[in-house]
From Swiss-Prot:
The keyword tRNA processing does not apply. Keywords: 4Fe-4S, Cytoplasm, Iron, Iron-sulfur, Metal-binding, S-adenosyl-L-methionine, Transferase. Its main location: cytoplasm. It catalyses: [[Fe-S] cluster scaffold protein carrying a second [4Fe-4S](2+) cluster] + N(6)-octanoyl-L-lysyl-[protein] + 2 oxidized [2Fe-2S]-[ferredoxin] + 2 S-adenosyl-L-methionine + 4 H(+) = [[Fe-S] cluster scaffold protein] + N(6)-[(R)-dihydrolipoyl]-L-lysyl-[protein] + 4 Fe(3+) + 2 hydrogen sulfide + 2 5'-deoxyadenosine + 2 L-methionine + 2 reduced [2Fe-2S]-[ferredoxin]. Its EC number is 2.8.1.8. Belongs to the radical SAM superfamily. Lipoyl synthase family. Its cofactor is [4Fe-4S] cluster. Residues 87-304 form the Radical SAM core domain. The lineage of its organism: Bacteria, Pseudomonadati, Pseudomonadota, Betaproteobacteria, Burkholderiales. Binds 2 [4Fe-4S] clusters per subunit. One cluster is coordinated with 3 cysteines and an exchangeable S-adenosyl-L-methionine. Pathway: Protein modification; protein lipoylation via endogenous pathway; protein N(6)-(lipoyl)lysine from octanoyl-[acyl-carrier-protein]: step 2/2. GO terms for cellular component: cytoplasm. [4Fe-4S] cluster 1 binds at residues 75, 80, 86, 315. This is Lipoyl synthase.
Length: 327
């Protein structure tokens, strides 16, 4: 595991350390559209409060095995509110290629910094860990690696190949970055070992991309999934959206229509929760009735499965989502 220094406070130019893992204000002080906090923080409504149960033996077992294997999970790095439930149930979303992202998205709690070199042992270590945990369904995601010529696609393939060698019955979902400028090369590489589910999150409405997803492009992300589907029509494609960043209901519905127009099969929609006072603020809490409306509209549009609700995250109950969609 990386022992890199973690910096949270904004740094001056002379004190800036690109090798450090930057979090919170340190990460977001250099984004093009600065985060503007609203006057009063919205109070969390009752329906989005996570019921924190006592950590189970399985929870501690997974954490110990992850540390012993030098592996990261997005559950921990992104401060997911569902970590207790998922770890307790023996599921985790593994984050490969390090814990420092080359992007600085102000909704995300994953650290930013100059990435470390790829760990050539990670694919086998990951496969051994999954076999040890006897997992039947795994999600593999990664930080953005704009420093790599293939965006990290070969590392995904190496992980998938190793997992299938040691756990041939385990189903694999990958949650990939956008492979900015390298999508055709990445898709060609992924042909060697396509996943059971291909996931890439659109995150929000296109109007909010400059603020929420600096360095990303809405149409580019849609095209990535459409291109993958054309190459692998038998593999379900999936994408997720957050609500609460300042979008309207109609904008969410339009994103859903755009997804279907680009052959995306599965959908997740969840409430955005701000990781810190330095991140984008929550601009609205969406009522359960509105989530229900989104879910009903999703099935009318033809999605094979839609997981919609305040605490839904892209990887939350991913196995149940996939099985409900026929995977």
């Amino acid at each position: 595991m990386s022992t890199t220094e973690v910096v949270r406070d904004a740094q001056s130019a002379e004190n800036y350390n690109p090798l450090a893992k930057q979090k919170a204000a340190a990460k977001l002080s250099r984004i093009p559209v600065k985060v503007v906090q609203q006057g009063e923080v919205l109070k969390k409504p009752e329906w989005i409060r996570v019921k924190a149960g006592s950590p189970t033996t399985r929870f501690y077992e997974i954490k110990q095995i992850l540390r012993e294997s030098n592996l990261h999970t997005v559950c921990e790095e992104a401060s997911c509110p569902n970590i207790g439930e998922c770890f307790g149930n023996g599921t985790a979303t593994f984050m490969i290629m390090g814990d420092k992202c080359t992007r600085r998205c102000p909704f995300c709690d994953v650290g930013h910094g100059r990435p470390d070199p790829l760990d050539k042992d990670e694919p086998l270590n990951l496969a051994k860990t999954i076999a040890k945990l006897r997992l039947k369904y795994v999600v593999i995601t990664s930080v953005d690696r704009d420093d790599l010529r293939d965006g990290g696609s070969q590392h995904f393939v190496d992980c998938i190949t190793n997992i299938r060698e040691l756990s041939p019955m385990t189903q694999i979902e990958i949650l990939v970055p956008d492979f900015r400028g390298r999508d055709d090369r990445a898709l060609e590489i992924l042909k060697a070992a396509p996943p059971d589910v291909m996931n890439h999150n659109l995150e929000t409405a296109p109007r909010l991309y400059k603020e929420a997803r600096p360095g990303s492009d809405y149409q580019f992300s849609l095209n990535l999934l459409k291109k993958f589907k054309a190459l692998h029509p038998q593999v379900p494609t999936k994408s997720g959206i957050m609500v609460g960043l300042g979008e309207t209901d109609e904008e969410i519905l339009q994103v859903m229509r755009d997804m279907r127009a680009h052959d995306i099969d599965m959908l997740t929609i969840g409430q955005y929760l701000s990781p810190s006072g330095s991140h984008l603020p929550v601009r609205r809490y969406v009522h359960p009735d509105t989530f229900k409306m989104f879910e009903e509209e999703a099935y009318k549009m033809g999605f094979s499965h839609a997981a919609v609700g305040a605490m839904v995250r892209s990887s939350y109950h991913a196995d149940q989502q996939a099985h409900a969609a026929g995977v």
